[in-house]
Amino acid sequence: MPRSMAAVDAQMLWMSAKVPNDQFLLFAFDGSPTRVPDAVDEMRRRAQSCPELGLGALDNIKWRYPRWQSGEIGADQFVTHPGARGWPDCLDAVTALAADQLDLRRMSWRAHVFPEVHGMPAAATGTVVVIQIGHALGDGKRSAALAGALLGRRGAIPPVAAQRGWLPARTVAAWRAHRQLLRDIEAGAVPPPAPPRPLLSINDSPRGNPVVRTLVVRREQLSVPTVTIGALTAISDALGGYLAGRGEDPSLLSAEVPMAGAGNGHAHNDFRNVGVGLHVAVDRAQRARLIAEELAAQRRRGEHPAMRAASAAFAATPAALLRWGTGKFDPEGRVAAVSGNTVVSSVNRGAADLSFGGASVVFTAGYPALSPMMSLTHGVHGIGEHVAVSVHADSVNVDVDDYVGRLRVAIGR
């Protein structure tokens, strides 16, 4: 039976018509199957046994929210890209996939198989599988779980029950909780929101072809004190130096970091973006401490009742009103300041227990989408003992090779 989408998921669906938001989850395996069609058939059988992978969008009534409905897993959801290729050519092919965004009314995900890739990091020759997922179907954490189900991870993925309620009551509750939040901020019990940051060249609108790069390291190279903090510290070092070398002032450099929500099971997307200063002017040890403190502060802010009340009020927004508001969004609009100059999305994709045609997973990567205000984004993705730090950049606004070279040095310190 169809179930209604949560407001935040519907907004993701409608926004995809303005700003493409498909996610591309890359998994690299340490060998190539003898028979690729058999490995693809196995993946299809796994999909058929997971109800959440059978969902598609039904959006046929303007005044109500779209619904999730179950459907068949089609053969066209599995695309094999034949032939041998090198790792750089594979990344170029992955980048090109973004030109064909999903229509969630037809399919909410698609699997791309590159069966023979040479010169991969951490493996000489292997297979690359890219799972393309519409953002309405899941945020970074849920999409990783769905991809895991396709690639052999055991365990059910729980369905989501959309939260509804009476908008006036929830609005009043949110207003009262917000007043308490302001009092708590003034008393120093809760941190204020991160301040807006001035624009830099990496905040120019993309003008060229997108380019992706991936650095793969052992987990212990970044996990001081955590992988996310280690990656942010290295990115601060590399990006601060890159910008300063071009005559820009990186002193207020900041990252926009998606932070997982409370996990209340009411939406496929449960996260919020927070601004985190990168503190380029201090030494690495102090920088790591300051970044850790800011992340902890934003986590405390997210746990305040006002945040939950605001989410509940948003969930009760009438569908027609939210659809109208999303339709008014101007993707070409510019703002004078940003919460973060670059995106750093960090997701732990679990144990190295995935397989494709008998080959074991070696590493996983992801490439957060560029946007009209963002010409450089980062993905930090771990599986097992390997972490991939990936860069997605506009080829005109960013000297990708220079920046990635700096990032490689910063990670190795």
Language model regions located:
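Generic N-terminal amphipathic, Lys/Arg-enriched alpha-helix
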Residues: 20-26
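Soluble acyl-CoA-dependent acyltransferase catalytic core bearing the H(X)4D motif
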Residues: 1-3, 26-38, 44-48, 55-372, ...
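Extended, hydrophobic beta-loop-alpha segments that form or line the acyl/peptidyl-thioester binding
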Residues: 373-413
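N-terminal alpha-helical "arm" segments
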Residues: 1-18
